[in-house]
Swiss-Prot record:
It comes from Escherichia coli (strain K12). One of its GO terms (molecular function) is lipid binding. Homotrimer. Interacts with OmpA. Has been isolated from outer membrane preparations as an approximately 87 kDa complex, suggesting it also forms larger complexes. Seems to interact with TolB, Pal and TonB. In pull-down experiments interacts with CedA. Disruption phenotype: Double lpp-ompA mutants are spherical and only grow in the presence of electrolytes such as 30 mM Mg(2+), and are sensitive to hydrophobic antibiotics and detergents. The peptidoglycan layer is no longer attached to the cell outer membrane which undergoes abundant blebbing. Transmembrane segments: none annotated. A lipid is attached at residue 21 (N-palmitoyl cysteine). An outer membrane lipoprotein that controls the distance between the inner and outer membranes; adding residues to Lpp increases the width of the periplasm. The only protein known to be covalently linked to the peptidoglycan network (PGN). Also non-covalently binds the PGN. The link between the cell outer membrane and PGN contributes to the maintenance of the structural and functional integrity of the cell envelope, and maintains the correct distance between the PGN and the outer membrane. Residues 1-20 form the signal peptide. The gene is lpp. The modification N6-murein peptidoglycan lysine is found at residue 78. Pfam families: LPP. This is Major outer membrane lipoprotein Lpp.
Length: 78
């Protein structure tokens, strides 16, 4: 995430440095691209956070299932 923001910052810095050599249309296009990329990064970050909770829930379910299996196995031992 930090690396992505660093890259985006470099793109913004590069576009401002090239402002003297570029047209306003090109600068506007680059700014639009940066905004689009920022939105995608935010969406991916939200998706990752949602997956973390799903993964934790799956781990908890697996632990409970393993515990039940362990309890069943101890009941059948002679």
């Amino acid at each position: 995430m930090k690396a992505t923001k660093l890259v985006l910052g470099a793109v913004i810095l590069g576009s401002t440095l090239l402002a003297g050599c570029s047209s306003n249309a090109k600068i506007d296009q680059l700014s639009s691209d940066v905004q689009t990329l920022n939105a995608k990064v935010d969406q991916l970050s939200n998706d990752v956070n949602a997956m973390r909770s799903d993964v934790q829930a799956a781990k908890d379910d697996a632990a409970r299932a393993n515990q039940r299996l362990d309890n069943m196995a101890t009941k059948y031992r002679k």
